[in-house]
Regions:
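A conserved glycine-rich beta-strand in the N-terminal activation segment of trypsin-fold
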Residues: 36-55, 108-109
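Active-site substrate-binding loop(s) of clan PA
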Residues: 102-105, 121-168
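Conserved H-D interstitial segment of serine endopeptidase catalytic domains
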Residues: 17-21, 58-61, 66-106, 176-184
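Conserved active-site neighborhood of the chymotrypsin/trypsin-like protease fold
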Residues: 58-62, 110-135
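Cleavable N-terminal signal peptides of Sec/SRP-targeted secreted and luminal proteins
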Residues: 1-13, 76, 337
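Extracellular trypsin-like serine protease catalytic domains
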Residues: 18-25, 38-42, 144, 149-306, ...
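Mature extracellular/luminal domains of secreted and GPI-anchored eukaryotic proteins, especially small
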Residues: 296-334, 339-343
Length: 355
């Protein structure tokens, strides 16, 4: 017990510190060492992000790894700054174990979280260190500042240009009630208590393809705390549809049940911003909705409307039928992406939706 307690205090003293981070400007390349917990997950190329949470475990999105048949195909890169040039502070590890949350729901992205155990521990440095995790009693209220990082696309059809530098962008927490209102245009049951939303009403800033599994962090004092794991959204940051993340604080017990040695550091984030009022009315968007669903028509309960920001197949042909359909033959993966669809279009094209 004494040893385990010492290990926990050790991680708690290390987590969430980024001495090379001087605050950031949204949409810019991140200086080396700014986000030392950021990892890049590779099969044959970068597919997703993730967060280092202790010396041997990474937290990512379940949809990033649920399709993998075995761990040898997956490599974790830590201390990486760019995807196509040398990275002097980088180390890599293979993955020996993948643990997907048992409640992960493939069509609906609920409980979209997974743990990866690396082949051996890493040594912490200014460029490689763990992030703190939001404890179960954390509160992230409306308008709280947050930051998202990753190597994903810079636009819907715009891959990250060479040399593929790690990008950072600011975001604001969106209340769960408002987020449910926004996504009710698609389905009343999209947003659950296991999710946290962030973004801006006007859209245009946030995660895109290739950013899945990466961190949404907020700063408290000198510590950065992981609030969410990039999960899904509509298009790439469509107006009036905030990006959706797995809410890390909901999974404290599950994470602790699988990591019994050198446990991650959990800290309670206390927000001073406006509390989410569940019985308030929905804010009517001032901007044109990104989805055109005819009045009186009930949308199908298919979360294939939306996209998980995974980047498994970058060279796929796109078929535009008022929605975008992508099929990845490698790994037999199917991704359904949204672009201005309605009930009648779904009825006509339903045969394409096979998850």
């Amino acid at each position: 017990i004494t040893c385990l307690h010492w290990f926990y205090l050790h991680i708690l003293s290390e987590c969430g510190l980024a001495p090379l981070n001087n605050r950031i400007v949204g949409g810019e390349a991140a200086p080396p060492g700014s986000w030392p917990w950021q990892v890049s997950l590779h099969t044959f190329a970068h597919i997703c992000g993730g967060s280092l949470i202790n010396d041997q475990w990474v937290l990512t999105a379940a949809h990033c790894v649920s399709w993998l048949g075995s761990t040898p195909f997956l490599t974790v890169y830590l201390g990486r700054q760019n995807q196509s040039e040398s990275n002097p502070n980088e180390v890599s590890r293979t993955v020996t174990r993948i643990i997907i949350h048992p409640g992960y729901n493939i069509p609906r992205f609920n409980n979209d979280i997974a743990l990866l155990k690396m082949s051996e521990p890493v040594v912490f440095s200014n460029y490689i260190s763990p992030v703190c995790l939001a404890a179960f009693n954390s509160t992230f209220n409306i308008g709280e500042d947050a930051w998202v990082t990753g190597w994903g696309n810079i636009g819907y059809d715009e891959p990250l240009p060479s040399p593929g530098k790690l990008l950072e962008v600011d975001a604001e927490i969106v209340g769960t009630h408002q987020c449910k209102c926004d996504y009710s245009k698609i389905d009343d049951d999209v947003i659950t208590d296991n999710m946290i939303c962030a973004g801006f009403r006007e859209g245009g800033k946030g995660p895109c393809f290739g950013d899945s599994g990466g961190p949404l962090v907020s700063q408290q004092g000198d510590r950065w705390i992981l609030a969410g794991v990039v999960s899904f959204g509509v298009g790439c940051n469509a107006p009036n549809f905030p990006s959706v993340y797995a809410r890390v604080s909901q999974f404290e017990s599950w994470i602790k049940s699988h990591i019994t040695r050198n446990r991650p550091g959990f800290l309670t984030f206390v927000s001073n911003n406006t509390e989410d009022v569940l019985n308030s009315s929905c804010t009517t968007p001032a901007l044109t909705p990104a989805i055109n669903i005819s009045e009186g028509q009930e949308p199908r309960k298919l979360i294939g409307y939306m996209l998980g920001f995974v980047n498994n197949c970058q060279d796929l042909d796109k078929i535009y039928c008022h929605f975008v359909y992508k099929e990845c033959k490698q790994n037999e993966m199917l991704f359904l992406l949204l672009s201005n669809l309605n009930q009648q279009q779904l009825s006509n094209e339903n045969e394409h939706f096979r998850l």
